[in-house]
Amino acid sequence: MSPKKTPAPLVGIVLGSDSDLETIQPCMATLKEFAIPHELRVISAHRTPDAAHEYARTAAHRGLRVIIAAAGGAAHLPGVLASLTPLPVIGVPMPTSVLGGLDSLLSIVQMPSGIPVATVAVGKAGPVNAAILAAQILAEGDAALRERIVQYKVRLAERVAIADENVRNPP
């Protein structure tokens, strides 16, 4: 009996630092919920620029279809990766102790013409929204994944309806 083969990753998650690992966990959990294979790397745009360049230049050839890049402070990682790959890059600005993540957000969102980085929120919603955006990109041409996204959004709406009912009619 042969061992079960792990599917090749479609999404690459790249952290600028391992200190971002806890913050990015909801992203990985959401990708898992959608059954999207992914890989996780720690590569710094500033401390390991050669590795960042190699990762970006080989990502499409290795079968990745989307890159999620999380970085804080002088958060250049998403932009560096976007400048070197034809794949869509989603930037996740990490919260920082000095400016609360505003520095990260502005570093990621202010890209020059021709080098887009899709940017999500700082804080808890950012990693989850990055995974959902990656899923929506991948769902183009994948009806089963598209249906999983539709059902996810139905569950979100149901939770809001329950919360509304609870506040309108308290026990």
Residue spans for each PLM region:
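Basic/polar N-terminal segments that are highly enriched at the extreme N-terminus
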Residues: 1-8, 171
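Glycine-rich phosphate/diphosphate-binding loop of Rossmann-like nucleotide-binding domains
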Residues: 8-47
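Short glycine/serine/threonine-rich phosphate/pyrophosphate-binding segments
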Residues: 20-24, 48-52, 71-80, 99-102, ...
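N-terminal beta-loop-helix "entrance" segment that forms/cooperates
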Residues: 40-61
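Glycine-rich phosphate-binding loop
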Residues: 55-97
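Short, glycine-/small-residue-rich phosphate/pyrophosphate-handling segment
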Residues: 97-147
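Glycine-rich phosphate/pyrophosphate-binding loop and the adjoining helix
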Residues: 138-171
